[in-house]
Amino acid sequence: MIHIPYSLNATTLKLPSLIPQLEQEIPADAAGISYGKAEDKMGWNAQPTRMVTFDNVRVPVANRLGVEGQGFAIAMEGLDGGRINIATCSIGTAQQALEEATAYVQERRQFNSAIADFQATQFKLADMLTELVAARQMVRLAASKLDNKDSQATTYCAMAKRFATDVGFNVCNDALQLFGGYGYIKEYPMERHVRDTRVHQILEGTNEIMRVIIARSMLRQ
């Protein structure tokens, strides 16, 4: 297993070893390495996505991650942290969307009143904030368990990822709704928040898989 943390624009591919001193680089255009087309994605357009293909690429032993045949296990070890990361991305984006929506509803007027004065708007804002705070606390709990190598860390990371990414998308979607038709126009940030958070429910394991992990942990106890 090798790891490539650099984009296509880089001149080298860094292939880290488990021993930092052995970290080396190979040319990004080394024989056998090829790149697919830039994918035209729904969201996350600030981050280019391409397939990287290896065809009989020679990789020095010093650049190998761990023992041969252990690639899958090494990859799985990184998933818990990745799930915390994507959950945090959802919370941050949703927080921004909520702040923008809160400001907007105090400015937008209908029927001679700011729409923030309507009880329906207030209930929506209250629910958005409550769920966002709950999601943030769940992610913090899962991160703490991961840092402390708790035996249930994987389960808590799955719960945090599932909950926070669902909440994040829902908050952004509700924020777009509060903007009305303006929320659907690219001049305003809401449509991007919705597009970007949608993939969070898929990355690092779909939220359906998170439910499988959680349920299996419950049934083992």
Regions from the PLM with identified roles:
Residues 1-3, 64, 176-179, 183-184:
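Active-site beta-strand/loop segments that form the cofactor-binding cradle
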Residues 67-68, 117, 149, 186:
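Residue-level signature of the cytosolic catalytic core of signaling kinases
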Residues 77-85, 115-118, 122, 150-161:
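Active-site oxyanion-binding pockets that recognize sulfate/phosphate
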Residues 76-77, 171, 179-221:
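Glycine-rich phosphate/cofactor-binding loops in nucleotide/flavin-utilizing enzymes
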Residues 1-99, 103, 113, 208-212, ...:
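FAD-binding core of flavoproteins
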Residues 167-175:
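Hydrophobic alpha-helical segments of membrane proteins
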Residues 102, 106-113, 129-163, 176-179:
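C-terminal helix-coil-helix/basic helical segment that borders enzyme active sites and/or dimer interfaces
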